Amino acid sequence: MYRFDYIVDYYPESKLDVTEGQRLDRQMIQDFMFGDPSEELIRQIVSRAKTTVSDEAIDLVCFAPGTTGAKTLLRFDKISEVLAEELDCDVYINAVSLQFDSDPITHIRHYTCAKEIVKGKKMLVIGSVYTTGEALTEVGDLLIKNGAKSVYGLFVAKTIM
């Protein structure tokens, strides 16, 4: 299990009895997923990234892959440059990537990572929505196996069932 933090609670579309604030958070998350993060969300991601691992300087930020490489790029392209500047570290969108896109039915994922980039690094993995922790565990284990010193997770949202 890897230490992680998140910014907002996410109530899935199946939950119809949500407050106006929860509905607005849901919309903010959906905007992010479609590549249009608000300035406020970018500010929150940077702020939370700084405090998530305040006891340890981060060497490298990467992103938890979406279901396709195109979705990963869409979600994280606008925030990667800001993170690099604000955290004063390297940011690689594809330090971890899908070997091939996820199967839409089984959701089976096969990750690869750029060993030469992650070796010896203290890593922050930023993802969209934390539900079970399975993706963070798979990505974290892969990073450690390929030489990362430590792995922390930061998510835009955590699913509330």
Where are these regions (language model features)?
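Short, glycine/charge-rich flexible loops or terminal/linker lids adjacent to PRPP-binding catalytic cores
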Residues: 72-124, 134
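A structural signal for isolated positions on well-ordered beta-strands in alpha/beta enzyme cores
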Residues: 60, 124, 151-154
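A phosphate-binding catalytic loop at a beta-strand-loop-alpha-helix junction
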Residues: 127-139
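PRPP-dependent phosphoribosyltransferase catalytic core
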Residues: 10, 14, 137-161
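Short beta-strand-loop/turn "lid" adjacent to the catalytic site in phosphate-handling enzymes
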Residues: 59-71
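Structural alpha-beta junctions
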Residues: 2, 84-92, 146-150
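Short, flexible/disordered intra-domain loops and linkers
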Residues: 19, 69-74
